[in-house]
Amino acid sequence: MVSEFPGPGSRVPWRPRDEALRVNVGGVRRLLSARALARFPGTRLGRLQAAVSEEQARRLCDDYDAAAREFYFDRHPGFFLGLLHFYRTGHLHVLDELCVFAFGQEADYWGLGENALATCCRARYLERRVTRPRAWDEDSDAPSSVDPCPDEISDVQRELARYGAARCGRLRRRLWLTMENPGYSLPSKLFSCVSIGVVLASIAAMCIHSLPEYQAREAAAAVAAVAAGRSAEDVRDDPVLRRLEYFCIAWFSFEVSSRLLLAPSTRNFFCHPLNLIDIVSVLPFYLTLLAGAALGDRRGASGEELGDLGKVVQVFRLMRIFRVLKLARHSTGLRSLGATLKHSYREVGILLLYLAVGVSVFSGVAYTAEEKNVGFDTIPACWWWGTVSMTTVGYGDVVPETVAGKLAASGCILGGILVVALPITIIFNKFSHFYRRQKALEAAVRSSGQREFEDLLSSVDGVSDVSLETSRETSQEGRSTDLETQAPSEPAKSHSY
């Protein structure tokens, strides 16, 4: 009988070399013959079979049960079944259930190279590996999957799970989904339509207010009215437009405060770009009120000081144009555009660099070739002409007259077409990707009528501290659970390979 724990001076191997290898891979138990493993000594299981000591064997597996003489591997069980087929036939086939990245990791772990792939699967694997998409924030232009990322779904799940321990969690969650997801229910669609209408009405009122017939007074008249003790708003604004502005501000303030109260996390609320846009859309109004109060408190100030405060008020009023960005909350295209610009900063930087180089070169040529009295007096003045020409805008305010200047203008225009077209194609492909991805994510999480989303909500409702703790313990003791699936009195079915 071979001793499992030989003494330091013993020369008896720790296990017979012809003994079958008992392995457990992710709960799948198999008994592998030594002869089958000896055919592939370079693989992990082949080296494990040839290990001369228990210490060497333990370095090749995740755990070892000396009593059962069983080796445990915390790896993908599906790939292990394909690995068994490899030991039988000598060919490895690609698994469709694993992505190229995960399949390659498993193959590297078990000590298999590309030569182990079967001929029928090798070309497909190599093609998928070459075109395997990488993260958009890397130097990659290959389009990735349009399916929602598991991390994005997990973020939604974590946000919803925060309502489990909150007071009135179910009601707050439904109200939050109603405000955040236009397709969640009929009330959410109505709320979205009303919000879009208020945004458009606010923008229309701001544009109409700039027309001459709606401006009863100029800025100087407003300052004079404040000095006389009257309100500048009463002088400058049309009563109808002023009431419409107050209504829009009340609605925007209601939206911001409601989202803040219903948000699952206050910290995440202030980190979300759309919420910051909502705050910026109402902030100018309240800053204008503060500036108006400051004007009212300084009636004895000089006209120059009042004029400066009046300019500050005008700047605050112009900031209302940022309200148009509120439409991004209700527009998949605008959100996709924002994500595209966020992940295309390299391409945008390259585009600006190309334009800067081209403008500098052709501006210098035009400055040298043209006369000084036709708009090319200085190189900075030529920069304007070069920028307009390279972007193919062509205002026509500055036109070269000499032959050399016209040749430089032709080269500037052709160079602009080539320079702008190259990065634009990459940016457009990324926009198409993020648009499809955003649509897929919305379809996965916003409709409560779908079975997946209902299961998600019900799982969030049913989560308790006990179930969470039980789930945590189950995940931590997954390996022991797999080992206990078969009673000791009932030996596992062994297969020799």
UniProtKB/Swiss-Prot annotation:
Superkingdom field: Eukaryota
Extracellular compartment residues: 209-239, 292-309, 368-379, 400-406
Disordered as annotated region, ranges: 464-497
Subcellular location(s) of the protein: Cell membrane
Motif range (Selectivity filter): 392-397
Distribution of this protein across tissues and organs: Highly expressed in brain, but not in the other tissues tested.
Pfam family, one: BTB_2
Entry's Gene Ontology cellular component terms: membrane; nucleoplasm; perinuclear region of cytoplasm; plasma membrane; voltage-gated potassium channel complex
Intramembrane residue ranges: 380-391, 392-399
GO biological process assignments: action potential; potassium ion transmembrane transport; potassium ion transport; protein homooligomerization; regulation of potassium ion transmembrane transport
Transmembrane segments: 187-208, 240-262, 274-291, 310-330, 346-367, 407-435
Topology of the protein relative to the lipid bilayer: Multi-pass membrane protein
Protein keywords: Cell membrane, Ion channel, Ion transport, Membrane, Potassium, Potassium channel, Potassium transport, Transmembrane, Transmembrane helix, Transport, Voltage-gated channel
UniProt biased composition (Basic and acidic residues): 470-482
Membrane side Cytoplasmic: residue ranges: 1-186, 263-273, 331-345, 436-497
GO-annotated molecular function: potassium channel regulator activity; voltage-gated potassium channel activity
Major localisation: membrane
Quaternary state and interactors: Heterotetramer with KCNB1. Heterotetramer with KCNB2. Does not form homomultimers.
Family: Belongs to the potassium channel family. S (TC 1.A.1.2) subfamily. Kv9.1/KCNS1 sub-subfamily.
Protein task: Potassium channel regulatory subunit that modulate the delayed rectifier voltage-gated potassium channel activity of KCNB1 and KCNB2 by altering their kinetics, expression levels, and shifting the half-inactivation potential to more polarized values. While it does not form functional channels on its own, it can form functional heterotetrameric channels with KCNB1 and KCNB2. Each regulatory subunit has unique regulatory properties that can lead to extensive inhibition, significant changes in kinetics, and/or substantial shifts in the voltage dependencies of the inactivation process.
Cross-referenced PANTHER family: POTASSIUM VOLTAGE-GATED CHANNEL SUBFAMILY S MEMBER 1, VOLTAGE-GATED POTASSIUM CHANNEL
Domain notes: The transmembrane segment S4 functions as a voltage-sensor and is characterized by a series of positively charged amino acids at every third position. Channel opening and closing is effected by a conformation change that affects the position and orientation of the voltage-sensor paddle formed by S3 and S4 within the membrane. A transmembrane electric field that is positive inside would push the positively charged S4 segment outwards, thereby opening the pore, while a field that is negative inside would pull the S4 segment inwards and close the pore.
Protein name: Delayed-rectifier potassium channel regulatory subunit KCNS1
Species the sequence originates in: Rattus norvegicus (Rat)
